[in-house]
Amino acid sequence: MPDNEGQHSVARRDGGWKRVVLKLSGEAFAGEEQLGISPKVVGYIAQAIAEAVAKGIQVAVVIGGGNMFRGAELSQGGMERSRADYMGMLGTVINCLALQDFLERLGIETRVQTAIHMSQVAEAYIPRRAIRHLEKGRVVIFGAGLGAPFFSTDTAAAQRALEIGAQAVLKGTQVDGVYDSDPRKNPAAVRFDRLDYNEVLTRGLKVMDATAVSLCMDNGLPIVVFDLMGKGNILRAVQGEKIGTIVCPPDV
């Protein structure tokens, strides 16, 4: 396994990231629909990832399953929470396979690794194998969250990033950064260019859930929040350009 010392420094010497985890919401995959998968959206995401790989950036992806199932919402409707969460995990795998298909159509070797064993469609999650795939220029897509209920795919993204030695978690959202309130409801909302983890937690800002933010804070792992569907934004984010909001240690 490679030496991971200094793996979470904000940028490498040439100003970009070398290895990143791209966190995508399941809702994004649905496009303008509330459920299902939009080929147009997945194709756009795959093309952007392919461009990043062509530039030598190692890209791993974690996808939510909200376009299929949301465990927390199902449990509110009376379903047992653990079972609902497992349904959500299976939904993430559907999204992973869709993205894999679009990437491979573009000639990008892709591996799906899941936290729940399903050997007919994906590899089991093995960190050292994931790192080796990335070093070979393959995209690795992590599915089924952490394989345990009560943990979000945000937390899975943070944990996977730490374990494979990624330099940042890049979270693609429907807005262009982190605001002090919802900009879709409040035209006067103020966007932050930079935040530290404690500020995110104490103010309850919508970056990631508290568990994921705390995990990143404890390990100095930067989080970049950006507008997923903005033209060229995925490539800009993975190249380490200034975009959206960065959450990082205050002294970096």
Swiss-Prot record:
Binding site for UMP: 65, 85, 146-153
Cell inner membrane listed as a keyword: no
GO cellular component: cytoplasm
Amino-acid positions noted as binding ATP in the UniProt annotation, renumbered to this chain: 23-26, 66, 70, 173-174, 179, 182
NCBIfam families attached to this UniProt entry: pyrH_bact
GO terms, molecular function: ATP binding; UMP kinase activity
Alphabetical list of InterPro entries matching this protein: AceGlu_kinase-like_sf, Asp/Glu/Uridylate_kinase, Uridylate_kinase, Uridylate_kinase_bac
Keywords: ATP-binding, Cytoplasm, Kinase, Nucleotide-binding, Pyrimidine biosynthesis, Transferase
Catalytic activity as recorded in UniProt: UMP + ATP = UDP + ADP
Annotated Gene3D superfamilies: Acetylglutamate kinase-like (3.40.1160.10)
HAMAP family: PyrH_B
Enzyme class: transferase
Description of how activity is regulated: Inhibited by UTP.
Protein name: Uridylate kinase
Localization, UniProt: Cytoplasm
Example of a GO biological process term: 'de novo' CTP biosynthetic process
Biological pathway: Pyrimidine metabolism; CTP biosynthesis via de novo pathway; UDP from UMP (UMPK route): step 1/1
Subunit-level organization: Homohexamer.
Family of the protein in this entry: Belongs to the UMP kinase family.
Job description of the protein: Catalyzes the reversible phosphorylation of UMP to UDP.
Domain of life: Bacteria
Enzyme Commission no: 2.7.4.22
